[in-house]
A protein has these predicted regions:
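Alpha-helical transmembrane segments and their helix-helix packing motifs
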Residues: 1-131
Length: 131
């Protein structure tokens, strides 16, 4: 991802990307760790919903679910570690973003795992009631 950020900085749009991304990255890097973690958990949950829905409905409905989940995480300002890697690589150095990025990775993973386990638990409960 940082390779892509480096390559984009070499293009005619690189200066504008850096100008636009700079304040966003500064806000993310100055946020508290708990805030980053909680926003990343929410994003992880949305990404789990998107993927799980598409697996169940690999058609236009699943595609719409993915589109909606991604739109919500962007509009809500949730933290997605992969998306942030690109922006961090544009305007910051690894020493400045390593810890926040690690927190986002943990938050994204936690959100997805929690929702996955909750879904499995509900399904097991339904199956045991029907048996």
């Amino acid at each position: 991802v940082n390779i892509m950020a480096f390559l984009m900085k070499q293009t005619r749009v690189g200066v504008r990307l850096v100008e636009k991304a700079g304040p966003i990255v500064e806000t993310k890097l100055s946020d508290t760790y708990i805030s980053l973690f909680l926003l990343a958990v929410c994003c992880g949950m949305l990404m789990y919903i998107a993927v799980a829905t598409f697996k169940k409905q690999p058609n236009i409905l699943g595609t719409i679910a993915v589109f909606l989940c991604v739109s919500v995480f962007i509009l809500a300002g949730f933290e997605h570690c992969i998306a942030n890697m690109f922006y961090f690589g544009l305007v910051s150095t690894p020493t400045k973003y390593a810890v926040p990025l690690l927190i986002m990775i943990l938050g994204n993973s936690t959100g997805g795992i929690l929702l996955c386990k909750l879904t499995q638990h509900v399904q097991i409960q339904k199956n045991s009631e029907n048996a």
